[in-house]
Regions:
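Short clusters of hydrophobic/aromatic residues that line enzyme substrate/ligand-binding pockets
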Residues: 9, 61-63, 225
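Short secondary-structure boundary segments
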Residues: 59-68, 74, 157, 288, ...
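PLP-dependent class I/II
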Residues: 4, 27-33, 38-54, 85-87, ...
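Conserved PLP-binding active-site segment in aminotransferase class I/II-type PLP enzymes
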Residues: 1-19, 28-31
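A glycine-/small-polar-enriched, mobile loop at the entrance of the PLP active site in fold-type I
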Residues: 34-39, 53-71
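Conserved N-terminal alpha-helix of the aminotransferase class I/II PLP-enzyme fold
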Residues: 62-95
Length: 400
């Protein structure tokens, strides 16, 4: 068994890397330390590298389509790791989950229609809705900081508001995030059941973004929304990709599961309108290798991420108690409650950049309820995380 060294620091600068090479273009100092965008500072697994090397050495990168080995790897992964027995014809390939969200918005709603999301949430949800001339309706998650201090995440769904919004705003589409980015909730079967029943009552289609489904911390379990009830599967578009799990975002491949044939055809029609047909040749290779032989690497990675999370928690408690960790149940993106610093929104964002020298994701990006928060990516060597936390401590210590 290969032992992977996640402590090793890999220099990503000069690789056209969005995370490290575009600070100035995005209004940040050139020397800012980035822990923002959701990719990892770890090389991929040995199996993926070997498969890509073989494909590169072949030397021809023509038009490609996946065959049986690809689909079997994807379906076996979902059954093995997420207890979901799928069928090949359910799978629609897209270059990414955000691309798929846009296709779903156009396939299942009309301009002017309302689409419901749960802020604070991954900001492309809002952008995709508005950019396609639809209306954003927000079922804001309830946050109780005292719950988080006792070990609970602190976020929960306001189900009364959820159903009221569906009815009053004539919602056609709900975009679910499970696990939820950025707050880190992994929704329970009971919560998903309640959401699904409400959506069925109001004839709402669910697009479930489950791209972080392989990152769940001990004591929690990810449940595919479509598996909770066969009726839910008939109204659900489930979005998955190997990009977050195996650090393959740049290879642009995702797998969208749509059991309902009518919904699948409508979705595929929108994909066809974009002219997208053949997936990235190397993306196919990497995805198949990851799902076929990536579990050992992933198991080691999960253990390392847990160490990083524990390190972060202890550091904040001991050295920066003004910043509260919203205990994540899943994802390697951690939500920090900075409300005790007394600054929010743009002022907080600028403090993080100018005084701490860090590039995090400001909470306001995820919705108004995130103004006092910052999102930090802990998928990096622990030395990088420690450096970032020391910079943050120095800035907070000097905050007047």
């Amino acid at each position: 068994m290969t032992r992977y060294n996640f402590d090793k620091i890999t220099n990503r600068k000069g690789t056209n890397c969005l995370k490290y090479d575009f600070a100035v273009e995005r209004g940040k100092p050139a020397d800012v330390l980035p822990l923002w965008v959701a990719d990892m500072d770890f090389p991929v697994s040995e199996e993926i590298t070997k498969s890509l090397h073989a494909a590169v050495e072949h030397g021809i990168y023509g038009y490609t389509q996946p065959k049986d080995a690809y689909y079997n790897a994807v379906m076996n992964w979902m059954e093995r790791n997420h207890n979901w027995k799928t069928e090949r014809e359910w799978i629609v390939k897209t270059p990414g989950v955000v691309f798929a969200l846009g296709a779903a918005v156009k396939a299942f709603t009309d301009p002017g229609d309302a689409i419901l999301i749960q802020n604070p949430v991954y900001y492309p949800f809002t952008n995709i809705i508005r950019d396609n001339d639809r209306r954003v309706v927000d079922n804001t998650l309830i946050y109780e900081k005292t719950a988080g201090q006792s070990g609970d995440n602190g976020y929960r769904i306001d189900f009364e508001d959820f159903e009221r919004k569906l009815e009053q705003e004539h919602i056609k589409l709900f975009i679910l995030c499970n696990p939820h980015n950025p707050v880190g909730r992994v929704w329970t079967v009971e919560e998903l059941q309640q959401l699904g029943e409400i959506c069925l009552r109001h004839h709402v289609i669910v697009v479930s973004d489950e791209i972080h489904n392989d990152f769940v911390y001990p004591g929690y379990e990810h449940t595919v929304f479509a598996t909770v009830d066969p009726r839910f599967a008939e109204v659900t578009v489930t979005c998955t990709a190997p990009s977050k799990t195996f650090n393959l975002a740049g290879l642009q491949i995702s797998n969208i599961f749509i059991p309902n044939e009518k919904l699948r055809k409508a979705f595929q029609t929108e994909i066809d309108k974009t002219g997208y047909d053949e997936p990235n040749a190397l993306g196919i290779v990497a995805c198949e290798a990851a799902y076929r032989a990536g579990e050992d690497w992933l198991d080691q990675l999960r253990a390392y991420l847990l160490k990083n999370l524990n390190f972060l928690r202890n550091f904040l408690q001991e050295k920066i108690p003004q910043i509260h960790l919203v205990e994540p149940e899943g994802t390697y993106l951690v939500w920090l409650d900075c409300s005790e610093l007394g600054i929010t929104g743009e002022e907080l964002d600028q403090f993080i950049v100018d005084k701490a020298g860090l590039w995090l994701d400001g909470g306001s990006m995820f919705g108004p309820s995130g103004a006092a928060f910052q999102r930090v990516n802990i998928a990096c060597p622990q030395a990088t995380l420690e450096l970032a936390l020391n910079k943050l401590k120095a800035a907070v210590d000097n905050l007047k």
